[in-house]
Amino acid sequence: MQGLKVMISEEEITKRVKEIAAQINKDYSGKELKLICLLKGSIFYTVELSKYLTMPVKFDFMTVSSYGSGTKSSGHVKIKKDLDESIEGQHVLVIEDIIDSGRTLSELLPLLKEKKPASLKLTTLLDKPARREFDVDVDYVCFEIPDKFIVGYGLDYDQAYRNLPYIAEIVE
């Protein structure tokens, strides 16, 4: 059985998400924003962030993965669920749970740009720059973390731990 060590508390997450929302509110003042939640891991961050956004928002969802089961990236990016609506001419914010190698987003963002949004920005709850293999420009980062396998607040280990209200490291 693995144990969990809290890395980022629920209170720390809420505080930082409010700070990110304040910056997004400033950047998109007077505009409508389309939020693209990358399922499943980003759902917690998307919901929390959207509560503090003051502009009109619309939601869409994608399922994109480079993970199979376990803790390592499979090296293959799959779009399992595409957008339901066009993003042409809209201001779009892609919401990610964690950026590891950058492979998924390095392939996804160019595909989204082809759909001709008015603007396209990216936010992530967690960033692991030590693992980066592909260049990804991230506009809003909540937390930079070390190269540890973490769970909670939407992130899972074989579909478990997703419901934790905090970010934890799995320890042996």
Regions found by a protein language model. Name each.
Residues 1-172:
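PRPP-associated nucleotide enzymes
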